[in-house]
């Protein structure tokens, strides 16, 4: 049975989620020693801007890019905020796109600093969500 981490990276006009995903994947490799799958709607951007992406991502799933009508406020500090498009609907398809039998779906801005998340694989449940964070 394979285990791995699935990251979604769908950039908007201001946030490079692919860059975040690459950093996140480097931490996953260091602390969890798990394969990482990147699901993105801009494969060409990944290939052009991150030439060494295969070091970080074991699998790539190309998502269809759809027009987005969703907008979200992003806050950067106390006095700065921007309302930007938010491409997050594909996460609902995580079970359909993951190449792993057991998958941790992780936000790209999560910074891993230990192997605590590996405990998630000890549970025989179809869906787990953290009630408290450490």
Predicted segment positions?
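Glycosyltransferase catalytic domains, chiefly GT-A lineage
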Residues: 1-134
């Amino acid at each position: 049975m394979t285990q791995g981490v699935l990251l979604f990276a769908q950039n908007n006009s201001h946030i490079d989620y692919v860059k975040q995903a690459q950093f996140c994947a480097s931490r996953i490799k260091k602390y969890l020693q798990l394969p990482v799958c990147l699901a993105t709607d801009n494969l060409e951007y990944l290939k052009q801007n991150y030439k060494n992406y295969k070091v970080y991502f074991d699998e790539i799933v190309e998502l269809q890019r759809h027009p987005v009508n969703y907008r979200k406020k992003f806050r950067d500090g106390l006095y700065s905020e921007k309302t930007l498009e938010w491409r997050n609907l594909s996460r609902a398809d995580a079970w359909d796109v993951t190449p792993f039998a057991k998958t941790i779906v992780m936000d790209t801005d999560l910074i891993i600093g230990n192997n605590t998340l590996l405990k998630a694989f000890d549970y025989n449940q179809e869906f787990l969500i953290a009630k408290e964070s450490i």
